[in-house]
């Protein structure tokens, strides 16, 4: 995330979830009024430990961690109070999408939603 990119995105009506990897970038985003951020690459920059450390320092800031998250680790992230959602390529593997196998994508998405205890019906 850069301030210039954020300013351009915020000037539109498009959804914008900037990516951050450091506390300094979180501070910049917060100063711009952005309180929902993508943490990427989550596992490489500290993962769960980083998000736990950021929670008390940045109250009111929520994260969507991506990068290195898989079906096995997603529940640990979703248990954190500052993580309402996670992202991961396991929900839509490249080869499954390329094959147009939307039933498998749907099944994987339903399994992912169940990890967070969300009703998919």
Language-model features: where?
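Glycine-rich phosphate-binding active-site loops on the catalytic face of alpha/beta enzymes
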Residues: 1-5, 38-47, 82-104
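Glycine/small-residue-rich loop that forms an oxyanion/phosphate-binding "nest" at active or ligand-binding sites
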Residues: 1-23, 32-34
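Glycine-rich beta-to-alpha transition loops that act as phosphate-gripper elements at the mouths
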Residues: 1-2, 18-23, 42-45, 64-71
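Generic hydrophobic/aromatic pocket-lining and core-packing "Φ" positions
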Residues: 6, 26, 51, 74-75, ...
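C-terminal helical cap(s) of enzyme catalytic domains, especially alpha/beta-barrels
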Residues: 9-11, 95-121
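Hydrophobic faces of well-ordered beta-strands that scaffold small-molecule active sites
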Residues: 16-19, 37-39, 62-67, 84-88
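Catalytic cores of alpha/beta
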Residues: 24-32, 55, 69-85
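Conserved, mostly hydrophobic/aromatic
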Residues: 37, 77, 112
